[in-house]
């Protein structure tokens, strides 16, 4: 894997810097490195593809070295270099695709394609060994079963979940009280509602709670907490739990009271915040518990009082909500996040070449399915294919 990264890094630098008119002295070190790559690869044969619709391709390396010059690089020099670069880039691209479409239930962190296994040989270590990529660094750590650490921005840690629970219900669905939520990606939105605006509740207050368990532990997380849930701020028609009917939700938004968010690890509270909004942090956690209250306003203008009558019908429904968004965090496991395209890269290649469903990943690389059942086998394979996708993205956009 590190050899593949080094190949890609050398080729990217060569493609960017070996251009007509450049002084040879400015790129002499790069050309020496480029020639070392050619020397190491010459005389070797590889085969890629042969799975799904990914075609079999054979690769043979027999290239001349780039020479030295006291002057600027001319058109002939650059054309010779470009022919070599283009062949190598095509080779790296196909090795990456060949690796990205394979999976294994055992030792999925190790190379799975014949071409990458061959590149793992000791003789290829002479190719400008470079371990500067976060993905490569963590792949090496995971390969040795040592602790890894990925930094993510808006990590897709929450499987998609959108539903509701009713704490008070009746067949007519005209005086409901409960909670509805939408968890997806890096964000939780939860709303508590009471059609009667807590008119008969103790102290005219309804208590709500929402607990979310993560599939992986996050550490050093920067989080935004807001006293609102905008996705539940407009009228909608909702299917009943049994699917037999629908009910109408017409929210009027109040500010939540006594808001508390707890971050827990293995059942132990690590961080707690009360009535604090904006940016907060959490050291390490695998569970988030949100609790908040809906309090009937003790004093209301006639207009507000008309919204919340003391008896049915309740045409407007008192609602309070919270939004929690993980802006950045560190995780030992690889995840999809907002700043990278690894999941899309892997998925698009597998779709384009009609790769059959294997023993590890769900059909279509469905992220909600994948993260919901994030087994050690999936974790190993995902880290490997994301690492390869990061290498491919250096050359192929």
From Swiss-Prot:
Coiled-coil residues: none
GO molecular function: host cell surface receptor binding; metal ion binding; structural molecule activity
Cystine pairs: none
Record's keyword annotation contains Protein transport: no
Binding site for Ca(2+): 266, 286
Region: Interaction with the inner capsid protein VP2, residue numbers: 62-73
Compartments, record wording: Virion
Function: Intermediate capsid protein that self assembles to form an icosahedral capsid with a T=13 symmetry, which consists of 230 trimers of VP6, with channels at each of its five-fold vertices. This capsid constitutes the middle concentric layer of the viral mature particle. The innermost VP2 capsid and the intermediate VP6 capsid remain intact following cell entry to protect the dsRNA from degradation and to prevent unfavorable antiviral responses in the host cell during all the replication cycle of the virus.
HAMAP family: Rota_VP6, Rota_VP6_A
Name this polypeptide is given: Intermediate capsid protein VP6
Organism encoding this protein: Rotavirus A (isolate RVA/Human/Sweden/1076/1983/G2P2A[6])
């Amino acid at each position: 894997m590190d050899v593949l990264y080094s190949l890609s890094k050398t080729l990217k630098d060569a493609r960017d810097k070996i251009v007509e008119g450049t002084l040879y002295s400015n790129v002499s070190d790069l050309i020496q490195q480029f020639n070392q790559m050619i020397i190491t690869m010459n005389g070797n044969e590889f085969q890629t593809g042969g799975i799904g619709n990914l075609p079999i391709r054979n690769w043979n390396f027999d290239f001349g070295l780039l020479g030295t010059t006291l002057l600027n690089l001319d058109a002939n020099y650059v054309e010779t270099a470009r022919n070599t670069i283009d062949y190598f880039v095509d080779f790296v691209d196909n090795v990456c695709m060949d690796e990205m479409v394979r999976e294994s239930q055992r030792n999925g962190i190790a190379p799975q394609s014949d071409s990458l296994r061959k590149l793992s040989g000791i003789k290829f270590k002479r190719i400008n060994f470079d371990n500067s990529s976060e993905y490569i660094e963590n792949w090496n750590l995971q390969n040795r079963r040592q602790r890894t650490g990925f930094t993510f921005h808006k990590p897709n840690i929450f499987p998609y979940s959108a539903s509701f629970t009713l704490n008070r219900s009746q067949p007519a669905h005209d005086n409901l009280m409960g909670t509805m939520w939408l968890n997806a990606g890096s964000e939780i939105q939860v709303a508590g509602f009471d059609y009667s605006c807590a008119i008969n509740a103790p102290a005219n207050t309804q208590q709500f709670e929402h607990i979310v368990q993560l599939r992986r532990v996050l550490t050093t997380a920067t989080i935004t907490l807001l006293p609102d849930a905008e996705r539940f701020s407009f009228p909608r028609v909702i299917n009943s739990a049994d699917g037999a009917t629908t009910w109408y939700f017409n929210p009027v938004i109040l500010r939540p009271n006594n808001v508390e968010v707890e971050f827990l690890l293995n059942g132990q509270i690590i961080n707690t915040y009360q009535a604090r909004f904006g940016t907060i942090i959490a050291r390490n956690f695998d569970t988030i518990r949100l609790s908040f209250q809906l309090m009937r306003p003790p004093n209301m203008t006639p207009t507000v009082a008309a919204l919340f009558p003391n008896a049915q019908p309740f045409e407007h429904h008192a609602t309070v909500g919270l939004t929690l968004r993980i802006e950045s965090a560190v995780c030992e496991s690889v995840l999809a996040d907002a700043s990278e395209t690894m999941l899309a890269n892997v998925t698009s290649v597998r779709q384009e070449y009609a790769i059959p469903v294997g023993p590890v990943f769900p059909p279509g690389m469905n992220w909600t399915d994948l993260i919901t059942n994030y087994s050690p086998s999936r974790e190993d394979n995902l880290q490997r294919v994301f690492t390869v996708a990061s290498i491919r993205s250096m050359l192929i956009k």
